[in-house]
């Protein structure tokens, strides 16, 4: 393991910040890519989510930011709003050593006018989806004249979503003299073609899936298709995870599994492609703040999910692609933490299990299912209040915290994460005081205005 301090160009303040964030040593992708990135070279990297790639390009682009220059100097393109939010959050943490650095996300599904207002003072860094960014470029609300670093994150996913033309159009607005960093989980011909068009003699780095595999205990259970839900309920009763993601291959199974867990008192939410954007946002917020213990999701819907301490991942169905299997289980061992991944295998999935074994070069750890016993509940510690207002009402976490602890009299220990979104604020409060907080906040005020509050269920 190589320490970040070996990178002589990182300033002491950044090294101190990395230490405070718990980043003590570099991941394989960081060790391979950062020297070239910090030297200003173009780099193309094939690596999975969870490999530390955000910090790799984040540390690089931050070294080129002049906070006294109020122009956009770095751009990160992402396939989804969720990934953009995740990347922006990580960049803000990495940028704590650099005061007054403005980072802005520009994604579809958010009011254009609100974004236009935020752009009156140009951000130093923009994290965006290609379509919405192109809208702003064409309307003249964003300028890339001072851009020195362009990053394309999950480039293969952007192509899958049909963003190829939009990416080309965006790049036409960028200066030719820039550093371009391209990250992709896979490397199809279309990605190689984009690299050839937009990069100059890039350093090619490939982090093999087996090299990047974190310290995860994998357990496999042979069961019938009909036996999967009872087995899942028993295993959740046994392990009692504070947070768990269950992966299903279809939206139908995703909802059926979620409903079955809730029926026995195991708090679960579902995340799949049929959800409206608002419902999707609320689901992600509620799971992240502890208002549900289990998230049942499809692979596409879970892209960009950022949960720091995920104790357990369950493959309700084995993925068709072994690379997807690695991507799934890697969510339970972020930043070097260990994790547990459980996979169910019905007889018709045996071939998929063999492919996973061959690819990862491991002997599968087959387990005996626990004996039939009573199902234990899995209750969430927190509940979520949704307050109308958010960024457009200039609400801050401190405003909400003050209302809850001052006017309503909640103990600070009863309040969890406060997430401020454009039109809403989501507040996690302990279940025991949730109804009291909701009822009293209904008639109360935040920043002098009466607020509309809902208790999400």
From Swiss-Prot:
Gene responsible for this protein: dbpA
Reaction(s) catalysed by this chain's protein: ATP + H2O = ADP + phosphate + H(+)
Keyword Thylakoid part of the UniProt annotation: no
Annotated Gene Ontology cellular component terms: cytosol
Main location: cytoplasm
Highest taxon of source: Bacteria
Motif DEAD box, residue numbers: 153-156
Annotated effect of mutating residue 154 to A: Shows accumulation of partially-assembled 45S particles
SUPFAM superfamilies: P-loop containing nucleoside triphosphate hydrolases
SMART domains for this protein: DEXDc, HELICc
Similarity remark: Belongs to the DEAD box helicase family. DbpA subfamily.
Organism listed in the record: Escherichia coli (strain K12)
Protein name: ATP-dependent RNA helicase DbpA
Subunit structure: Monomer.
Start and end residues of each stretch annotated as Involved in 23S rRNA binding: 383-457
